[in-house]
Regions:
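Short, solvent-exposed loop/turn segments at secondary-structure junctions
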Residues: 10, 15-17, 39, 54-56, ...
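Catalytic core of non-heme Fe(II) oxygenases with the double-stranded beta-helix
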Residues: 26-89
Length: 144
């Protein structure tokens, strides 16, 4: 069994915009929303799946560290490069990631959702920061 985020996130990363907001903790103005998903209460075993509808590359994509707590310079993070209809599984729950202003002329559209192997799932009394849905089966997650 797999625990699946019930409602996927649909991302639109428009030219000359970021698809996430700046945070007070951002050290640099051009690196926007530096965070791990765990900071927002997500389950420690959660994995991110990104399924692009359009090609993801350069500044219309996500920048991420190679491994958790890498102490990697933020400017050395890689851009996630994916062709449409491919997908990527990432540990953005533990790895820092951020956006930049999209300087390409391509709007990135992607479906982003989270999974947890059922064998690693346990109940935490936490809720989504953005919509206050509990990170529990039947609320934020479904079992497939």
């Amino acid at each position: 069994y797999i625990v699946l985020q019930k409602t996927p996130n649909i991302r639109f990363h428009l030219p000359n915009c970021s698809n996430i907001g700046k945070r007070d903790t951002d050290k640099y103005t051009d690196l926007i929303g530096v965070h791990t998903d765990r900071e927002f209460g997500h389950h420690p075993e959660e994995l991110n799946i990104i399924f692009p509808i359009t090609n993801m590359f350069d500044t219309n994509s996500i920048y991420y560290e190679n491994s958790p707590n890498s102490n990697q310079n933020l400017y050395d993070f890689q851009s996630l490069k994916l062709n449409e209809n491919n997908f990527s599984i990432n540990n953005f729950n533990q790895c820092l990631h951020y956006n930049k202003i999209n300087k390409t002329n391509i709007t990135r559209v992607s479906l982003d959702f989270r999974i947890i192997p059922y064998s690693k799932f346990f109940i935490e009394n936490k809720s989504s920061v953005s919509n206050n849905i509990k990170f529990q089966l039947g609320d934020y997650y479904i079992l497939i």
